């Protein structure tokens, strides 16, 4: 209901609103009917990318370069001026194919989640933010990024269709980074405008929701995320970088698996290794993905290197995070003593309120 209300309250309302219901078993379809929102019904196994493609296919033919697609998740509520601000950022920038908002926590609305996203060479999702960072305007502005989350992304429709939409091998997770990478390789750019704000619950990533998409082997979010991260790197990188990237992926997976075992999380450890194994036994998927991307590539895929964190940056960030969490474990504040997080509380709260085992959890 909050998402539907947020769409209806936009200062610049969308020209058309289409919802896609992928086999929900709650009252979503009834809610959409009551709100008079056109909606499509797909099977529960459909991924986000294919759902968007189905929705776009119902639109009249694209006749203008100024036609845009605004994507929202069912757990992402836009501020009432979000669409207006996103459109303002691209009004005089014809080379921009994608723009996204600042993303804050759903309940803790001072918790800064994203101002653009990237991917590290070991497959880690990279936001450039501290795990418990609060929004004080320190990252505000309009600037280029590798990509933005699909929760709130505004995409030029002509470019979306020219690139073939999202890769349907990425049912969930990392489809945003992959699409942004392909946008850059096609000679276009991606922006963030922090004047636009979205509040996101990240229900799937935080494991509050079962992952039922077809590609989700064993329905494990971490397994799907790691597999998709490796797929994005192997299908988008230049061919001569593939051996090094493969070694980095294997090394990082082994290190994280060992860390999970020390943290007594064997399920997550197995996810790390199974993710790579799933790609190893299906090299045809990587070959097909590389061939598909090559058709629309106008510049070297290394154009996005400037948006990727260096190894030094990653190492320093990991050490700082580890130090902060050890300090929190040894010297807890009064607010951290005896606190229990219920299912209804914000799972996106600062890391200091989470279990120390989150040291090894993938960054969101």
Residue ranges of model-derived segments:
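Short, acidic, metal-binding catalytic loop of nucleotide-sugar glycosyltransferases
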Residues: 5-14
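A conserved acidic beta->alpha catalytic loop
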Residues: 13, 21-30, 44
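Glycine-rich, basic loop-to-helix element that forms the pyrophosphate-binding segment
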Residues: 42-61
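Short beta-strand-to-loop acidic/aromatic patch adjacent to the donor-nucleotide binding site
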Residues: 64-77
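Conserved donor NDP-sugar-binding/catalytic core segment of glycosyltransferases
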Residues: 79-120
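A short, conserved alpha-helix in the catalytic core of glycosyltransferases
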Residues: 146-165, 169-197
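Active-site-adjacent helix/loop segment of glycosyltransferases
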Residues: 186-285
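Non-catalytic, C-terminal membrane-associated alpha-helical segments of glycosyltransferases
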Residues: 239-363
